[in-house]
């Protein structure tokens, strides 16, 4: 990264299909932005929502990694601001760790990390495997054609997270339903606000029970070990962050992963070649698919020069994870799915202090899901052309349905 300021980046109109996909690949509009360099200025819906004349768009790997790892010059904490449309951007989501800076971020993250150690993940794997087996039993009973997304991909991540948090099993179905309704951006703000209020009431009751009698789930563990140092609002925020970051991400990675592997069948056999190769398949799918296309906007809190461009304090930067992971600066032939490529340090699960705390658990779940699916259904194939697969409007990219047959 140079420190000299080059000519100011051109101001570009935000494309209509900005941050959308064409099946498993970035929409071609994203490549149009890349032609102007790894860091550009755009004006459009994003700048209007953030109350700025323009925002920076970072899509080169080195630039994105630099920005995600720099909490000296950038913050993810939302600010009170009046946008041009009259809408307000909220100041802070209490407890949602992705919007915190040190030292508050450090305090909350330390509460979570014991639950995501390798030892803890190994202890969870039998329960996750049982859940995967049960969902595939239901898929098979529905067959020989069924919606893999609705019967398998969606429930696996959601119910595994419920078990992790300590959500009672009798509550899990309704809990998951509310998660999905609240994340559905196609529903109106009023409807989503009502769902959010009901969800918060449920969390209030759950936390009251955990305060009185903590169980062995993540919430119970935090209450037992840190009860005097964490508020209920922070606990609710941690729950929300884990739900938004975990449920849809795993669902999207299973659904998109199946689409990608069916389109690249030579990669499927690598899942069974060795544990190391299976791990590489999962890592390559995370790089190739990057279901969380754009993390929280970064707000510059100090002037900083990146890639020859002066980003001033008060400027917002949007980072494209998907485009960064499809950059030749990261790996040759980045638009090819190839688990045999040399290992890379992609940003599929983020980078820096906001690196996904549950990344190792997610990888373990994905490996088990892919392996068990193809062990049970070696003749799996799409029941429709991939162009007919529909995608949902949510915080994380995810197929709405994946019709399969076997």
From Swiss-Prot:
Q: Which residues form a coiled coil?
A: none
Pathway of this protein? Antibiotic biosynthesis; vancomycin biosynthesis
- The domain of life is Bacteria
> Which GO MF terms are attached to this record?
heme binding; iron ion binding; monooxygenase activity; oxidoreductase activity, acting on paired donors, with incorporation or reduction of molecular oxygen
What InterPro entries does its record include?
A: Cyt_P450, Cyt_P450_B, Cyt_P450_CS, Cyt_P450_sf
Residues that bind heme: 356
Its GO biological process terms? vancomycin biosynthetic process
Matching entries from Gene3D superfamilies are given as: Cytochrome P450 (1.10.630.10)
* Swiss-Prot/TrEMBL cofactor(s): heme
Q: What class of enzyme is it?
A: oxidoreductase
- Write the Enzyme Commission number(s) for this entry: 1.14.-.-
Q: Does the keyword Heme apply?
A: yes
Give UniProt keywords alphabetically: Heme, Iron, Metal-binding, Monooxygenase, Oxidoreductase
The keyword Oxidoreductase belongs to this UniProt entry's keyword annotation = yes
Biological function: Involved in the coupling of aromatic side chains of the heptapeptide of vancomycin.
Annotated family: Belongs to the cytochrome P450 family.
Question: What's the protein name?
Answer: Cytochrome P450 165C4
Gene (name only):
cyp165C4
């Amino acid at each position: 990264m140079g420190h000299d300021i080059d000519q100011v980046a051109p101001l570009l109109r935000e494309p209509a299909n900005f941050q959308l996909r064409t099946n498993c690949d970035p929409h071609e509009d994203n490549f149009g932005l890349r032609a102007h360099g790894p860091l550009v200025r755009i004006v459009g819906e994003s700048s209007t929502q953030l109350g700025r004349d323009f925002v920076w768009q970072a899509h080169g790997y080195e630039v994105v990694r630099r920005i995600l790892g720099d909490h000296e010059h950038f913050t993810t904490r939302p600010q009170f601001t009046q946008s041009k449309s009259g809408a307000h951007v909220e100041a802070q989501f209490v407890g949602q760790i992705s919007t915190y800076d040190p030292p508050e971020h450090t305090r909350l993250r330390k509460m979570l990390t014991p639950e995501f150690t390798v030892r803890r993940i190994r202890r969870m794997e039998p329960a996750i495997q049982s859940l995967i087996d049960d969902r595939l039993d239901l898929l098979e009973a529905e067959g020989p054609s069924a919606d893999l997304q609705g019967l398998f991909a969606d429930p696996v991540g959601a119910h595994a997270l419920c078990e992790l948090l300590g959500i009672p099993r009798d509550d899990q179905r309704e809990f998951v339903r509310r998660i999905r309704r609240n994340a559905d951006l196609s529903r109106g703000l009023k409807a989503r606000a009502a769902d959010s209020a009901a969800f918060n009431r449920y969390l209030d009751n759950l936390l009251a029970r955990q305060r009185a009698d903590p169980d062995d789930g993540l919430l119970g563990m935090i209450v037992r070990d840190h009860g005097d140092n964490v508020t209920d609002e922070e606990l609710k925020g941690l729950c929300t962050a884990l739900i938004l970051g975990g449920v849809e991400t795993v669902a999207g990675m299973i659904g998109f992963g199946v689409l990608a592997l069916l389109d690249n069948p030579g990669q499927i056999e690598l899942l069974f070649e060795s544990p190391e190769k299976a791990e590489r398949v999962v890592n390559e799918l995370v790089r190739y698919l990057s279901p969380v296309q754009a993390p929280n906007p970064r707000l510059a809190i100090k002037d900083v020069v990146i890639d020859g461009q002066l980003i001033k304090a008060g400027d917002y930067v949007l980072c494209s994870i998907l485009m960064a992971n499809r950059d030749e600066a990261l790996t040759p032939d980045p638009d090819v799915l190839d688990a045999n490529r040399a290992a890379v340090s992609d940003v599929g699960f983020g980078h820096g202090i906001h690196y996904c705390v549950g990344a190792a658990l997610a990888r373990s779940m994905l490996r088990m899901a892919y392996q068990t699916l193809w062990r049970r259904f070696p003749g799996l194939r799409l029941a429709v052309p991939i162009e007919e697969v529909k995608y949902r409007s949510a915080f994380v990219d995810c197929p709405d349905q994946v019709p399969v047959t076997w």
